[in-house]
Amino acid sequence: MKMHSRIFTILVLVAITLTTSLFIACGEDNTDPTPVTPPQEEPEKKPGDKQDEEEEDETEMSDTNYNISSIVFPIHRNAGLSETITIYPDENNLFTERVYSVRYDHTRPYMMPASLSKLYIEFNSDAKTIYIDGVEYKKNTPYDFSKPVTVTACADTGTEKSYTIELKNFTGLPIIYINTASGQEVKDKENYEDATIEIIGSESLPGLAKMDMQIHGRGNVSWTAFTKKQSYTISLSSKQKVLGMPKHKKWVLISNYRDKTLLRNNVAWWISSHMPGIKYTPRFQHAELILNGRHRGVYQVVEQVRIDNDRVDINEMKPTDTEGEAITGGYLIELDRMSDDTDQWRWVLPYLQGGSHQANIKKPKIDESNQAQHDYIKDYLFKVDKLLGTSEDMEYVMETYIDMPSWAAQWLVFELSGTPEPNGPSSWYTFKDKNDDKWYCGPPWDFDYQSFVPSTANQFRNKKYVYQPQMRKYQPYREELVRQWEAVQPLLPDLINYINEQREYMRHSAEANWFIHEQNLKDDESHQNGDEYIPSDMAIDRMIEYLYLKWDYVENNIRNLK
């Protein structure tokens, strides 16, 4: 009997220790000055003792009153919300929800992010005490939910249960706030307007502190035809990393106005980045744009095509580079049917698609101050254009003046995306470097137009354009096309996985974007892509269908392309 008594005494001491520790975890003070009376031996209790059963029932009841059945962010206490938000925990005791507000402009709704830094919260719980990140909860105190917080609910017995509250800011993508100095819409495509920018980062992408910048409109057809959601060029006051991309001042905000998938550029640039012949593919991220206080939808934040060590990595010329080796490069050249043909610094190339397209020198800036650079690059381009159009010695032309891997790879990126852009290029980028006679292609740009359409998959849509018929006269160039294709041909499963990952990552953003622009897209009469009237998910499935068809067609036909 003494042995039983000792065991009982030890068990009681352990129970007291555990209970005390639970009270400490729930914020109770265990510094009671009253001495603890040593436990006394109690008579052995018989099974079925009524008093014992009542005590057990009471303990069971008190140990369940720390559950939190739901949390509430009431609209009457949170001015930034458009409705009361009630959230229930999942099996892992996680409360998670995406928080935003809905506003109206001329009766048309649009979504806006709600501030998560000062929200009033209420709990549906019988817990005796609740702690938020270790501090006792008070109903009339706002809390910061911009980051995950830990909530601890304590029962009368001191038993506790922990939960996590993880609110998603708006769609989960970074949020760009731009405010122009005038407070008006950006209407000028040529001249910059002063503005400020601030970027609120996401879980995986860093933000940017508020700073000065300038903004103007950009695009050709996209600027004039799609006025409800336009694209912009921005210039920061100093070089900065933006959403994890290398430092620079110049960035582009692409609206992807007519792209129901919101992924056409993503997919084309994924293909480009896996082409060994492409020296540079623009980096990008997606973000929500709040311009002058209004949500404009999801935008693609892209590196502007510039001469830079992290972009088009060629020599950057100075105005004084006017002779010898210095004048040979580097030049960033855009083949552009949209250029102003009255501009004396742009020239029609007679053998580029029958003389219907121009060469537009993007860098260096060509004007009266550097006439020598103008004359050099004009003479070079006219010489290569004529040789491609008239020479009988294609070996000499191709081996001397054409970088075959980059021309083959860029043409193939456009062909795999199915866009007819090479037929009338408005953004076909090329370049020539210093001390290098060869003409290079890249980077690929502009894939939101008539691309990834299943009905166009069973053909080479662009085989007649951007010098391709002339270049294919040379057998090694045809072999280069096959080499570039064989580098990406096995990667189709990886590409499909990437598309589905992006589909999920962009899901809430797509919902918010088309909440604003669905009707605008339907009202656009061009309907270039053929998916304007179907949901985003179906449009993405349609894109995947196209890729399977196109991959099969190219694999079966590229080795016979003449």
Feature names for model-found ranges:
Residues 1-12:
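Bacterial N-terminal signal peptides that target proteins for export
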Residues 22-25:
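C-terminal motif of bacterial Sec signal peptides marking the signal peptidase cleavage site
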Residues 27-173:
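Beta-rich interaction/scaffold domains
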Residues 127-131, 274-288, 419:
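Short, well-structured beta-strand/strand-turn elements
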Residues 167-263, 267:
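Conserved NTP-binding catalytic cores of kinases and kinase-like/nucleotidyltransferase enzymes
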Residues 177, 231-235, 245, 250-255, ...:
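Structural recognition of the beta-strand scaffold that forms the well-ordered cores
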Residues 223, 227, 358-424, 428, ...:
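Middle-to-C-terminal accessory/interaction subdomains
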Residues 235-241, 248, 255-257, 277-280, ...:
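Internal "kinase-insert"/substrate-recognition segments embedded within catalytic cores
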